[in-house]
């Protein structure tokens, strides 16, 4: 699929919809999808930190794990990550380790802070 054929807004809305799934399951409002170079969703995830008692179970990490499992590789070169909120430093680095090509997000770190998430300390260090 040619890059200009990918509907970024539509994919962002899918990630936002997963953030609603996360809220409905009793977790934080963060969702994520990963598409391959053909525009096919190969991974998705939502925040499971509270549900799994796992501080690394952010939506992006869950989507990366899901995508890697689905394609049978840790290398997501050429893939695009869409997330409901700007990735925290941990998630951003996980995406870099996975060779994610591009990242798009609906809300930024300041929006997250405005609803009570304490990510600033990780950006300021």
Tell where the protein language model's regions lie, with residue ranges:
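Short, basic/aromatic recognition patches
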Residues: 4-25
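Short, glycine-anchored, charge-dense loop/turn motifs used at functional sites
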Residues: 38-42
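Glycine-centered short loops/turns at secondary-structure junctions
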Residues: 26-27, 99
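Short beta-strand scaffold segments in enzyme catalytic cores
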Residues: 30-36
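Active-site oxyanion-binding pockets that recognize sulfate/phosphate
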Residues: 2-5, 53
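Zn2+-dependent cytidine deaminase-like catalytic core
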Residues: 13, 43-125
């Amino acid at each position: 699929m040619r890059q200009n054929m990918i509907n970024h807004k539509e994919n962002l809305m899918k990630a936002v919809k997963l953030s609603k799934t996360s809220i409905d399951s009793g977790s934080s409002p963060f969702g994520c999808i990963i598409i391959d170079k053909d525009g096919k969703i190969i991974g998705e995830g939502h925040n499971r930190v509270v549900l799994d008692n796992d501080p690394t179970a952010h939506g992006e990490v869950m989507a990366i794990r899901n995508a890697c499992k689905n394609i049978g590789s840790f290398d997501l070169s050429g893939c695009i990550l869409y997330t409901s909120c700007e990735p925290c430093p941990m998630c951003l680095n996980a995406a870099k380790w996975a060779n994610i090509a591009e990242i798009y997000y609906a809300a930024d770190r300041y929006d997250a802070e405005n609803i009570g998430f304490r990510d600033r300390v990780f950006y300021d260090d």
